[in-house]
Amino acid sequence: MKVTISQINPKTLDFEYNFNLIQEKIKESDVDSLIIFPELSLSGSPLYDSISYNDTHNKSIQYADKLSELKKDFIFGLPINQNGEILNALAFIENGELKAISTKKNLNRFDKGFSLGEGFCTIEYKKQTIAFGFLEDLDEYLKKQDKADLIICSSNILFTPETQKELLTSLQPKIRKAKTPIVLVNRCGAEASYIFNGSSFFMLSNGDLSKELPLFEESSLQIDTQKTEKYTQSPLCRIEKMYHAAVLGIKDYFRKNNIKKALLGLSGGIDSALVVVLAVEALGKENVIGVLLPSEYSTSHSITDAKASAENLGIEYYTIPIKETFTSALKALSPIFEGKEPNVAEENLQSRIRGMILMGIANKIGAALLNTTNKSELSVGYGTLYGDTNGAIGALGDIFKTDVWEMSRWINRKEEIIPQNSIIKAPSAELRPDQKDTDSLPDYDILDKVLFLHLEQSFINF
């Protein structure tokens, strides 16, 4: 049997866009191929409260009917309203006719508002028995020990560096036991803060991987389920995966929100130096603007490093010193501040001035501000509200500080793109003389290990 895996990147609630995308993939496929699309491919996801909107369901029906007019064989995902219950569904279309529907039974956090469905569905197709449904319902289906010639799963799997390895490790013994090949189709792309990794695949009945689509890219691949060739993986390293995920997050955020220009502050530190590389990779150097905002506490090497970071990438950049604005603010606040020892108030004021200037520029030129706070700082609240926490999207929001350094070294493996001094110098907010992050925080090597245990492995031991 010929099956086409169609790994697409839909836009949430943009039914017209998603319809055209699905239609294009269907028309590109062979006439006699069954085309498989990811979960909620017609509506996009996550849907959250929008699944209760009448417009969501009206458009779902409208565009599903238009897809049926193509007179092809395919499986696609959409929300349906069945007797007043909203279900996450997969529709099996054969030659323009709806032949079967699988509704999701084991719901996850993205399925808020959906009712429990019935799980896997079995259908006869071209003299073969096909079981199709959602990845979350697969274990329950396999326990029934029903015999099928092919299993088809649609999914929306979130990216982590270990996602694919963990999925394959979990799935292989189950497929060997079932002695049934499986096609798994996963969406790719980013939606707000969520990254979907793609990496759809075809696994043989002995658990060997036969075909795999790329990480993070829209891609289609036709397979013959009767062929048993084994696929040899060439996996990316952990940091390389994280790099491409971060680039995709920026790229899709700007594309899906119809924003062209990105703006960010360049401090000469490692975080902004990494974010500007990610932004240029995602948007092109012509669409990225840097702003240096030095203060009286900024070291000369910070300014030099910030300029080198911009010039190495060929982006447009400006220098706007904040000393005069800071002095004016202190003068305005002197009736309250006078006679009191300088403290965090003066430090945060500088950060807020920078945030104000950056947001002012972003608003004036129609750009979106990129936040450069890393996951370590974010997790412990090491930042200034309305200052360095400003931004439309946090490019490093899921990347620990130690990984920021490792990713920067990986980027520089062939040539110096990120200034070496930004990588090796001690991190500092430079809001007071000789300030270092370690004045307030443990060494990042220690902090990140603690944060990883709590945030990534749910370790609790009070």
Residue spans of the language-model regions?
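Enzyme catalytic cores with a strong preference for nitrogen-chemistry domains
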Residues: 1-265, 281-287, 292, 317
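ATP/NTP-dependent adenylation/nucleotidyl-transfer catalytic domains that generate, transfer
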Residues: 126, 179, 205, 231-268, ...
